[in-house]
Amino acid sequence: MSSPRLAAAVAALFLVGGASANDLQNFTTVQDTDWTQAGVGGMRGLGSGTITLSGVSGSVTQAYLFWAGPTNSTDPNANAGVLFGGTSIFGTNIGFSQDNFWGFANSQAYRADVTSLVSGNGSYSLANFTKPGVEVNGASLVVFFDDGNDTNNHDVVLFNGNDANFPNPFDALGWNSSLSGINYASGTAAISLHVSDGQNFGGDDDGTLRINGTPILSGGIFQGNTLPSAGGGVDNGNLWDIRTFDVTSFLNPGLNTLNFQLDAINDALGLIVAAVDLPAGAAPVTPIPEPETYALMLAGLAALRLATRSRKARATG
């Protein structure tokens, strides 16, 4: 039988990763790569659409499909099974959050590895993205490839999740995600944000997007007008956006941290993907935990060490 103290210490270690499971989490870092992204909005009420991919000029190494929308289900697999390019796929749930005031119980977001189904540029059909009590807003495709030219490669850090900007019981208030340990020397850097539920409620509906506390854009940032529409959605927006922001000016030679924030104003939004595009060699191999995460880890390790010593003392006493 295991020691209660030992079990508590191990549990504390596991709680480190689960404290804010619905905020964006680091999914993967792809180093020394070429990449592109595409998406489609206007899928609400249809459940189908097409993503037209361009910019691929070499062999595909990884490809990921993301989608999200409101649901009346507590089943994490409620909208996991869909069709991509006519092939059935099953996504991983990457977070529950607020329904963004649509009268549903929640929203759910998903990710699927579609590397084997993406051969290069072209049109990829989407179908079966709605079910009874389950809707979808849009979808994104993120593709990594090798064009044979190492001089134009990047490091890309992918965050994913389902982070609503309005107060809700699923995740922390607003958007607030960080990437630490960026070893920057030179070159351009950018952040691409894939956002669910963008609509136009006026010129100041989205508030202010901040990088490291500095405002970079205010007003109508995510209006549901940055991507092709499948033909559904609502009158004032296609409910899905991808926007890219240059963040080079926020990096200095040496170690850096990038933090991005958006508050809640008039437009309820869900952040699904954040892709941090860095010069090759700049990305940390693994994300470096924030200080509070270190504190929890150290506390758990200390408890584990104490429990182990106590067991040894009882065994020899």
Name what the model sees in each region.
Residues 1-7:
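Bacterial N-terminal signal peptides that target proteins for export
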Residues 6, 281, 286, 291-293:
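Intrinsically disordered, low-complexity segments enriched in proline/serine/threonine
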Residues 7-14, 298-299:
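Sec-dependent N-terminal signal peptides
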Residues 16-18:
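N-terminal signal peptide c-region/cleavage motif recognized by signal peptidases
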Residues 21-285:
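Disulfide-rich extracellular domains of secreted proteins
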Residues 289-308:
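A short, hydrophobic C-terminal helix/tail in secreted or cell-surface proteins
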Residues 312-317:
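Short, charged juxtamembrane terminal tails flanking transmembrane helices
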